[in-house]
Curated annotation (Swiss-Prot):
GO terms for cellular component: cell surface; extracellular region; peptidoglycan-based cell wall; phosphopyruvate hydratase complex. Binds a second Mg(2+) ion via substrate during catalysis. Homooctamer. The active site is at residues 205, 344. Keywords: Cytoplasm, Glycolysis, Lyase, Magnesium, Metal-binding, Secreted. It comes from Streptococcus pyogenes serotype M1. Belongs to the enolase family. This is Enolase.
Length: 435
C-alpha cells in the first residue's frame, strides 16, 4: 500500500519569478507528497548543480524543463515500486542514477524535489506530521530564528558589502514570543528608516535595503530599532548576526576582500588578516552572536585564524565554505575552521545527505543552522527539518514576504502541536560558545 506508483514534476515559479521544480509522489494507498525546490543568488562554487536549460529565448535561460524531464522520464522509472518509507534507499538510488559527484547529470534540483516529495508522501501514508516522521518521538526543539532585516550584497541594490544583517531573539521564552519580538523590531526599523528619508522597499529575503553609510550605520540603526521596540540588545534580549557572504567580494587574483565591489570607490580593500581584524573589531563593539561566511570559501588559512580568534565567543557559520557537504565539513572539523554549518537542502540535493551533515556537525560539537535560499517558494519543509533534527536554529528571512512567513507560520503550528513538550533554547542554542 505504501508503494510508489507515480512521480510527476512540473515547472513553477519561485519568489523571484524564476522557474523551479515542483514534484509530486503518489502511492498505492492514495498517500501523496509534494515538494518544491528553492534556489540561491550567491552560490558556493562547490554546491551541487542546479540544472538550468540555458535557452535564452525562454525565461532568460533559467528554465528547468530539462530537470522536469529528468524527473518524469528517468527518476520516476527508477523509483516507482519502492516503498515510500524507504527514504535512504530512494535517495541513494537517485545519487547512483546520476553518477556524478555534484549531481550534474540529473540536476540536484530534480533529485531534491523528489526527495522532499517522497518524505511528505511517507508522512501522509503514516498520518503523522512531517517533523515527526523525520525526527521521531524525540522531536521537541523549536529553532531560534535568524531574521534577516537588512539586505545588502547580492541580495539587494543597497551599497553594503555584507549580504545580511540579522537579529536573533535569544532571550525570548518561546518561539512564538521570539517571532513577535522580531516582528516588532522589523516595524520599528521601518519607522526609523522612513524618518531618515531612506527607502523601505524590501530585498529578496524580505529585509530592507536602504542606502546606509556603511556596515556600522546598519548595525547602529538596528540597535535603535531594538530599543524603540522596547527590547534590550544582548543575551537577555536580541542579538545581532551577519552573513558577510565574503566570497562575493573576494578578489581571487589579488587575494583581498574588495569592499568597493558593493560599496563603491573609497571603500576598504582588506587582506585576509585585515578581514579577521575587522570582524573582531565589530564583535568587540556590538552584541554580535553569529557571523556567516566571514572569509572566502577557499581562504582556509583565513578561516583558521578567524576561528582561533573568535571561535569561543561567536558562532562562525560555514555556508559557501561547507555547502552542506560532509567532505568539506570533515576537513573543517579536522583543521578547526569554523564552528557551525549552514544547512541548505539544495546545496547537497537529498534529505539523506542533509541529515548526515547535521549529524556530523553535532558529533563534532558544531552547531547546525537550517536555512532557506534567497529564491524561495511556499514550501515549508525546512521548518519541519529544523524541528525534526532539534537543530536549534533556523535562518529563513525577514518578517515580510509570504515565502518567508510560510516557514515561521509552520513553526508556530508545530509549537502548538508539541504543546508542553516544545522547547525554545534561545541563547542556549549556541552550546559550543564559552560565555
Amino acid at each position: 500500500m505504501s508503494i510508489i506508483t507515480d512521480v510527476y514534476a512540473r515547472e513553477v515559479l519561485d519568489s523571484r519569478g524564476n522557474p523551479t521544480l515542483e514534484v509530486e509522489v503518489y502511492t498505492e494507498s492514495g498517500a501523496f507528497g509534494r515538494g518544491m525546490v528553492p534556489s540561491g543568488a550567491s552560490t558556493g562554487e562547490h554546491e551541487a548543480v542546479e540544472l538550468r536549460d540555458g535557452d535564452k529565448s525562454r525565461y532568460l535561460g533559467l528554465g528547468t524543463q530539462k530537470a522536469v524531464d529528468n524527473v518524469n522520464n528517468i527518476i520516476a522509472e527508477a523509483i516507482i515500486g519502492y516503498d515510500v518509507r524507504d527514504q535512504q534507499a530512494i535517495d541513494r538510488a537517485m545519487i547512483a542514477l546520476d553518477g556524478t559527484p555534484n549531481k550534474g547529470k540529473l540536476g540536484a534540483n530534480a533529485i531534491l524535489g523528489v526527495s522532499i516529495a517522497v518524505a511528505r508522501a511517507a508522512a501522509d501514508y503514516l498520518e503523522v506530521p512531517l517533523y515527526t516522521y523525520l525526527g521521531g518521538f524525540n522531536t521537541k526543539v523549536l529553532p531560534t530564528p535568524m531574521m534577516n532585516i537588512i539586505n545588502g550584497g547580492s541580495h539587494s541594490d543597497a551599497p553594503i558589502a555584507f549580504q545580511e544583517f540579522m537579529i536573533m531573539p535569544v532571550g525570548a521564552p518561546t518561539f512564538k514570543e521570539g517571532l513577535r519580538w522580531g516582528a516588532e523590531v522589523f516595524h520599528a526599523l521601518k519607522k526609523i528608516l522612513k524618518e531618515r528619508g531612506l527607502v523601505t522597499a524590501v530585498g529578496d529575503e524580505g529585509g530592507f535595503a536602504p542606502k546606509f553609510e556603511g556596515t556600522e550605520d546598519g548595525v547602529e540603526t538596528i540597535l535603535k530599532a531594538i530599543e524603540a521596540a522596547g527590547y534590550e540588545a544582548g543575551e537577555n534580549g536580541i542579538m545581532i548576526g551577519f552573513d558577510c557572504a565574503s566570497s562575493e567580494f573576494y578578489d581571487k587574483e589579488r587575494k583581498v576582500y574588495d569592499y568597493t565591489k558593493f560599496e563603491g570607490e573609497g571603500a576598504a580593500v582588506r587582506t585576509s588578516a585585515e578581514q579577521v581584524d575587522y570582524l573582531e573589531e565589530l564583535v568587540n563593539k556590538y552584541p554580535i552572536i553569529t557571523i556567516e561566511d566571514g572569509m572566502d570559501e577557499n581562504d582556509w588559512d583565513g578561516w583558521k585564524v578567524l576561528t582561533e580568534r573568535l571561535g569561543k565567543r561567536v558562532q562562525l557559520v560555514g555556508d559557501d565554505f561547507f555547502v552542506t557537504n560532509t567532505e568539506y565539513l570533515a576537513r573543517g572539523i579536522k583543521e578547526n575552521a569554523a564552528n557551525s554549518i549552514l544547512i541548505k537542502v539544495n546545496q547537497i540535493g537529498t534529505l539523506t545527505e542533509t541529515f548526515e551533515a547535521i549529524e556530523m556537525a553535532k558529533e563534532a560539537g558544531y552547531t547546525a543552522v537550517v536555512s532557506h535560499r534567497s529564491g524561495e517558494t511556499e514550501d515549508s519543509t525546512i521548518a519541519d527539518i529544523a524541528v525534526a533534527t532539534n537543530a536549534g536554529q533556523i535562518k529563513t528571512g525577514s518578517l515580510s514576504r509570504t515565502d518567508r512567513i510560510a516557514k515561521y507560520n509552520q513553526l508556530l503550528r508545530i509549537e502548538d502541536q508539541l504543546g508542553e513538550v516544545a522547547q525554545y533554547k534561545g541563547i542556549k542554542s549556541f552550546y559550543n560558545l564559552k560565555k
